[in-house]
Amino acid sequence: LEAIIRANEVEEVWFSYSDVAHQYVMTAASRVMAAGAHFGVCSAERTMLKSTKPLVAITAVRTGVGKSQTTRYVSRILKDMGKRVVAIRHPMPYGDLAAQACQRFATYEDLDLHKCTIEEREEYEPHIDNGFIVYAGVDYEMILREAEKEADVILWDGGNNDMSFYKADLYLTLLDPHRAGHELSYYPGMVNLLLADLLIVNKMDTAPAEGVAEVIAN
């Protein structure tokens, strides 16, 4: 890192990774600053696109908390209210990124057409099984505009503990009592904690009581 900064006279370094401890971020920042460059992290507000449709974002403080299951639960509630729901999934692109700019999945044939990986299929298939359309890809402005054409409500199905790519009318953040305290010590999970309109403590049927209490207290 230091060699690249010095060899190329780099002036700014932007941290573009997620689900890492705050200590990790500041260690990287210290190395960058000592090498002579500015260090930055991206603002939530300035990186979010605005939809013309109501949008619900499902995020978390850590990866593996249960975002996708929650997205499917919320989508069923909205469907029962008579709303047309389209999910937009956090990107997992591999291969030819230009060809994957905007992907629409409504059937299993669409998954084959786009040569989805096993990881991608695991995320998309439950939505399809429940009768919902899923968008994903690379160009999230294009994806949003296409999704708006066939949705009354859009659901952001987040990945890792990344911030939503879109400005949400309702921002949901999941907390994990099996990893109590991480909601205050992981980036950008704590950003999601602070942005949330609604906090959900997941896995309460299996978590220790002290973990649940700590998460709620935090």
Language model features with spans:
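Conserved glycine(s) of the Walker
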Residues: V65-G66
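Hydrophobic positions on the alpha1 helix immediately C-terminal to the Walker A/P-loop
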Residues: Q69-T70, V74
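Flexible phosphate-sensing "switch/lid" loops adjacent to ATP/NTP-binding sites
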Residues: E2-N8, A57-T59, R76-N218
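Short, acidic/small-residue loops that bind anionic groups at enzyme active sites
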Residues: M33-L49, P177-L184
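Phosphate-bearing ligand-interacting subdomains
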Residues: L1-A44
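A short, basic/flexible loop-to-alpha-helix module at the beginning of a structural domain
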Residues: A44-P54, M142-R145
